[in-house]
């Protein structure tokens, strides 16, 4: 029964460090990993590969229901595998991003992907990375963590990432975009970005990633020992 398979949900706003934390925890525990944020991009890419109209809800639903996708974390790197092929770079293109925003607008597609995400719950356990993992997708998860950081700190982290890749970045614009996205996510009607009532809220503003990983793993192991 899947309810007996442990899940650790990691929710929170963009830039809080969820991805890095989830990869580290999946590797430390030897568990499966779900990057829910990439799911819509993977579906969009699958639709493009199979010449499925990304504006047809009817055509997208069966594709979403049987989406063949896996997430593999090795040495801190996440590999996104679609139908046996590494598509980690391909899902980051603008074409896929545009298509993803279209497929995500369909309620029946979202419902099909909700069921598909729950199917990732396999032994020995699952680390689920997202924004509504603990509130909507896995409300019965024994361990829920809401990873947060100030908008200012998240903007600085994002700026450093982009500068390392050679991009010229305007900090104030980045900060404004992050605040706007936070506002949209926290105030949307469906699955708003809020901590689950039983989640540990972990503020990473003053912590480095090693400290975040240590605190999260310690909390998870304590909770799982008594679950």
From Swiss-Prot:
GO biological process: nucleobase-containing small molecule interconversion; pyrimidine nucleotide metabolic process
Enzyme Commission designation: 2.7.4.25
Keywords, sorted A to Z: ATP-binding, Cytoplasm, Kinase, Nucleotide-binding, Transferase
Keyword Isomerase on entry: no
Chain residues that bind ATP: 12-20
GO molecular-function terms, A-Z: ATP binding; CMP kinase activity; dCMP kinase activity
Subcellular location: Cytoplasm
Catalysed transformations (reactions): CMP + ATP = CDP + ADP; dCMP + ATP = dCDP + ADP
SUPFAM superfamilies hit by this protein: P-loop containing nucleoside triphosphate hydrolases
HAMAP family to which the protein is assigned, alphabetical: Cytidyl_kinase_type1
Organism: Klebsiella pneumoniae subsp. pneumoniae (strain ATCC 700721 / MGH 78578)
Protein name per Swiss-Prot or TrEMBL: Cytidylate kinase
GO CC, any one term: cytosol
NCBIfam families, per the entry: cmk
Source organism phylogeny: Bacteria, Pseudomonadati, Pseudomonadota, Gammaproteobacteria, Enterobacterales
Xref: Gene3D superfamilies: P-loop containing nucleotide triphosphate hydrolases
Similarity comment: Belongs to the cytidylate kinase family. Type 1 subfamily.
InterPro entries: Cytidylate_kin (IPR003136), Cytidylate_kinase_dom (IPR011994), P-loop_NTPase (IPR027417)
């Amino acid at each position: 029964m899947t309810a007996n398979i442990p899940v650790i949900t990691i929710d929170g706003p963009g830039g809080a460090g969820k991805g890095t934390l989830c990869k580290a925890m999946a590797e430390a525990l030897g568990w499966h990993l779900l990057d829910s944020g990439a799911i819509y991009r993977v579906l969009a890419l699958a639709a493009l590969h199979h010449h499925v109209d990304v504006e047809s809800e009817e055509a997208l639903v069966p594709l979403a229901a049987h989406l063949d996708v896996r997430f593999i974390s090795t040495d801190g790197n996440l590999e996104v595998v679609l139908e046996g092929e590494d598509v980690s770079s391909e899902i980051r293109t603008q074409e896929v991003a545009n298509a993803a925003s279209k497929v995500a607008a369909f309620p029946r597609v979202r419902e099909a992907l909700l069921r598909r995400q729950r199917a990732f719950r396999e032994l020995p356990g699952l680390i689920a990375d997202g924004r509504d993992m603990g509130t909507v997708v896995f409300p019965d998860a024994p361990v829920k963590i809401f990873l947060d950081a100030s908008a200012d700190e998240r903007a600085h982290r994002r700026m450093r990432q982009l500068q390392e890749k050679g991009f010229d970045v305007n900090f104030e614009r980045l900060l404004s975009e992050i605040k706007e996205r936070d506002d949209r996510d926290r105030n949307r009607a469906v699955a708003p970005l809020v901590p689950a009532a039983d989640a540990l809220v972990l503020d990473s503003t003053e912590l480095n990633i090693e400290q975040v990983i240590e605190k999260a793993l310690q909390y998870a192991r304590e909770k799982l020992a008594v679950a």
